[in-house]
Amino acid sequence: MRSAQVYRWQIPMDAGVVLRDRRLKTRDGLYVCLREGEREGWGEISPLPGFSQETWEEAQSVLLAWVNNWLAGDCELPQMPSVAFGVSCALAELTDALPQAANYRAAPLCNGDPDDLILKLADMPGEKVAKVKVGLYEAVRDGMVVNLLLEAIPDLHLRLDANRAWTPLKGQQFAKYVNPDYRHRIAFLEEPCKTRDDSRAFARETGIAIAWDESLREPDFAFVAEEGVRAVVIKPTLTGSLDKVREQVKAAHALGLTAVISSSIESSLGLTQLARIAAWLTPDTIPGLDTLDLMQVQQVRRWPGSPLPLVDVDALERLL
């Protein structure tokens, strides 16, 4: 016997969260809980404003229609990426296809003062990996901050993300302020320039490795080995079903590329599932999941070690 619940939720964000020039005051999303006999599976559907093609309202409509079809015996996944991902996670939990083991070692995210990151990394056991958003300020400032971090922590490897913010000139201004002796410790820089060709040229001219992120979701993207390209960053909420995520990881690994499972600012429930996916599909790579601190609460499932208060499912708005 099948049953299902759908919940709608809204989480207040910290004041400083800006996405593509838009301040994100709340994170809005949906949960689906599927039950069959004694088994249960959860999934999160939370399109990311400015990045997802679909809106929260569109996702809700598609999810409710899919749940009604599932209750009637139809299991075909929806095409909408955020819904396909959330639904496939719920189905995978229902059938024990998503392993319980999780990789909760998130690469810490530097959102402001580099001194805060230096202190956080001092206590980090093992491999020291951190992420810095660049492209939000002047490229020269970004270069100086990155150089400072690499100089201060000799065993640090940085992942940088520019979200296609730079022109070729801005990219050169950034690189000018990063000591060439430190550049090999930039694990990769995600999508430095507005076009893929400009990003490839940036990698050639600076010796700084790049990674594809937004490119993976463009219709003309193909997985090929390219000089200067070291990694792909896979955001499942923006990608689609678990099967599609697994296909992309497999394609990247076949080319010798690093595949990084990364957050689209999901709630704690979604983040714990991403940690399980990372342990399953990319066991040797620290995932990019250090986004929970941008929120004011956790929901339904806790992220281990987080001091944020937990909102129980009974406090959420039930739609079905």
From Swiss-Prot:
GO biological process terms held by the UniProt record: menaquinone biosynthetic process
Needed co-factor(s): a divalent metal cation
Keyword Magnesium attached: yes
Keyword hit for Magnesium: yes
Signal sequence bounds: none
Keywords: Lyase, Magnesium, Menaquinone biosynthesis, Metal-binding
Residues where Mg(2+) binds: 161, 190, 213
Pathway linked to the protein: Quinol/quinone metabolism; 1,4-dihydroxy-2-naphthoate biosynthesis; 1,4-dihydroxy-2-naphthoate from chorismate: step 4/7; Quinol/quinone metabolism; menaquinone biosynthesis
Pfam families: MenC_N (PF21508), MR_MLE_C (PF13378)
EC number annotated for this UniProt entry: 4.2.1.113
GO molecular function terms attached to this record: magnesium ion binding; O-succinylbenzoate synthase activity
Active site, per annotation: 133, 235
Catalytic reactions on record: (1R,6R)-6-hydroxy-2-succinyl-cyclohexa-2,4-diene-1-carboxylate = 2-succinylbenzoate + H2O
Domain of life where this protein originates: Bacteria
HAMAP family listed in its UniProt record: MenC_1
Its job: Converts 2-succinyl-6-hydroxy-2,4-cyclohexadiene-1-carboxylate (SHCHC) to 2-succinylbenzoate (OSB).
Similarity section: Belongs to the mandelate racemase/muconate lactonizing enzyme family. MenC type 1 subfamily.
PANTHER family: O-SUCCINYLBENZOATE SYNTHASE (PTHR48073:SF2), O-SUCCINYLBENZOATE SYNTHASE-RELATED (PTHR48073)
Protein name, entry field: o-succinylbenzoate synthase
Higher taxonomy: Bacteria, Pseudomonadati, Pseudomonadota, Gammaproteobacteria, Enterobacterales
